């Protein structure tokens, strides 16, 4: 379901497995941010970034065969030699962009559309092209 520029899943689409896996994924992203802080300079990600990751249903952007891995902290194939990026990388890229609600973002390489969906509630407009 698309609501206000953000792809969201209705409550019925969020299975118990998805919710539990998402909670684990968000913990893992926070741990990864902390453990890579000396390299990246980002020991934690903004609450706003983490909240968007919590709301955007990654399982909507992966194939039926990969539903069980939708909230694994790893890239997944989406066909045509492309992948949906690792969630930590999506969070990191979003964090370092340091966007706000006045920004217009042009994304080159839409892929699954997940990164654009993550950016959408944080900025004024996202334009994306494959």
Give the role of each language-model region.
Residues 1-65:
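N-terminal auxiliary segments of SAM/dcSAM-dependent transferases
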Residues 96-130:
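Conserved nucleotide-cofactor-binding alpha/beta core module
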Residues 13, 41, 78-81, 107, ...:
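Conserved short-loop catalytic and cofactor-binding motifs
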Residues 27, 31-37, 49, 70-74, ...:
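Conserved alpha-helix/loop element of class I SAM-dependent methyltransferases that forms part
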Residues 4-5, 73, 94, 121:
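A short alpha-helix capping/helix-coil boundary motif
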């Amino acid at each position: 379901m698309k609501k206000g520029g953000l792809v969201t899943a209705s409550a019925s689409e969020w299975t118990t497995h998805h919710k539990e896996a998402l909670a684990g994924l968000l913990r893992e992203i926070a741990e990864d941010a902390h453990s890579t802080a000396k390299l990246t300079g980002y020991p934690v990600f903004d609450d706003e970034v983490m909240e968007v990751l919590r709301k955007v249903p990654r399982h909507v952007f992966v194939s039926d065969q990969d539903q069980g891995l939708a909230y694994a902290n790893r890239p997944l194939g989406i066909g045509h030699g492309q992948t949906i990026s690792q969630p930590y990388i999506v969070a990191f890229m979003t964090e370092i962009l340091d966007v706000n609600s006045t920004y217009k973002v042009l994304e080159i390489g839409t892929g699954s559309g997940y990164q654009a969906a993550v950016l959408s509630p944080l900025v004024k407009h996202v334009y994306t092209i494959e």
